[in-house]
Amino acid sequence: NFPSLKEAWVGSNTAGFALMNTQSYNLELGDIADDDRGPKNGEVIYRALEICATVEDFCHFLDTIQKPSGIEANFGVIDAQGGAAMFEVDGNSYKMFDANDPDVAPHGYVARTNFSNGGELNKGYGYVRFLEVDRVLSKACAMGGITPQLIFTDIARSFRNNILDIDLRSGDFNYPKTSGWFTDQDFIPRNNTSCSIVVQGVKKGENPELTVLWTILGYPPAGVAVPLWVKDNLPAMMSYDKEKGAAPLSAASLKLADEKVFHFKQGGGTKHYLHWENLYNLKGTGIMQKLVPVEEKVYQEALPLQQKFYKDGKVNVKELD
């Protein structure tokens, strides 16, 4: 997010209204360069977080903004009134997919990657990634347990590819069976992934300030989830550092990814080579494996605090120091 530019790509406000963007690449027809799609997405999210409180407010916002809007995106929205929906938005129109409508979302969720269902068929990106997201969520719904931990572990850090029918964590892609390298193709975490965020909202009648933004800054397999409450100030490790050019946690995670994971840089195209052995290995010394106890410690401290806030019906900022 870039407050100085009045741009944001994900966030929540004090009303419990939360909004995220995943760029769509198949809503606007024609020969459009990828970098030229959705130039106003960030500005729209920033403004919506300033003025919207509900899913209905966001519908009105989209109805009344100037057209063409410069938007091309899938917007995920939740509010503190029980609203949850996905919006496929182009420069002149939008389509809403209500997660509370069993005809639209029979399992109670709506998922998107970098294509829109209402867009041009077989265009865009992320079809293979979508298969993995849908597989994980449908199973979790059947077992009654979609949690931030599950989303981070089984989605944001998934190295399954459903077309190849492989999971790098199986052990079959580590030394000594292989060189420990693989190609970064259609896994959910990619070499350009810069964060993963789960917004844990509230039910109707609950205090919106109880909304939590569980946040991994940087490359998710090399990062740690941190809970953030809107009422609290951002901790220094999650705030922009001018010298580092990013928040300290983001800079550290991206540095690990650059130097240990995507560090084969001999010629064009080599950024897609993934040093899997450094991320995950049979000795248990991979980056992801070493960070597991660190993140577990975060959950051990944060979850009881979150439960206490729910019991009290409010967030006590002093307890977050």
Indicate residue ranges for each PLM-predicted region.
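A conserved hydrophobic secondary-structure block that centers on an alpha-helix together
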Residues: 53-60, 65-66
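Short arginine-rich
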Residues: 67-73
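C-terminal, well-structured catalytic/ligand-binding subdomain of enzymes
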Residues: 1-6, 10-11, 15-17, 21-50, ...
